[in-house]
Amino acid sequence: METGRQRGASAEMFAMPQGLKGSNKDGIPEDLDGNLEEPRDQESELRSQDVMDLTEGDNEASASAPPAAKRQKTDTKGKKERKPTVDAEEAQMTTLLYAMSEEQLSRYEVCRRSAFPKARIAALMQSITGRSVSENTAIAMAGIAKVLVGEVVEEALDVCEMWGETPPLQPKHLREAVRRLKPKGLFPNSNYKKIMF
């Protein structure tokens, strides 16, 4: 019965190769061991210097933030490029809001707060398709429906103004708005019949 070795392994396999002196616990020959330790020391000095540089700028960081050594480097270029466009959009939106009349501003606020109930949208989609609908799909469909209703209402308001009438909108305004939006491809043609021959 053999102990400490695998079957078929000879003592020669465990013997030290010729021409090499003893080795340390990592299996690195002693004559080469000194050369490998110097770069490790330099590397650890560089790492500690990088950590010090990171912590100097983070004196205001909260106590719940992870240590500087565990933080990952973030891409600041993308954020710098993205931020000015957001600021430009905010400035443009602010300008538009100041230019709106009181009626337009109240309509904008109502439109912004309105939403289709996602559970009902999901139930409607499920009844049409016969399959279960994910929450993300219902959210997307509710958003699309909100945009569609917004476009129909805007077109209906244009129709109402063009006809010389004043709001509130009436069904005839909505019908005319839908009729005008159909050629633009916003609504599918429900009277389409496939011609076989």
Curated annotation (Swiss-Prot):
GO terms for biological process: RNA polymerase II preinitiation complex assembly. Expressed in fetal brain and testis. Residues 37-50, 72-86 have a biased composition (Basic and acidic residues). SUPFAM superfamilies: Histone-fold (SSF47113). Signal peptide: none annotated. GO terms for molecular function: protein heterodimerization activity. Gene3D superfamilies: Histone, subunit A. One of its GO terms (cellular component) is transcription factor TFIID complex. CDD domains: HFD_TAF11. Disulfide bonds: none annotated. Residues 1-88 are annotated as: Disordered. It comes from the Eukaryota. Belongs to the TAF11 family. This is TATA-box-binding protein-associated factor 11-like protein 12.
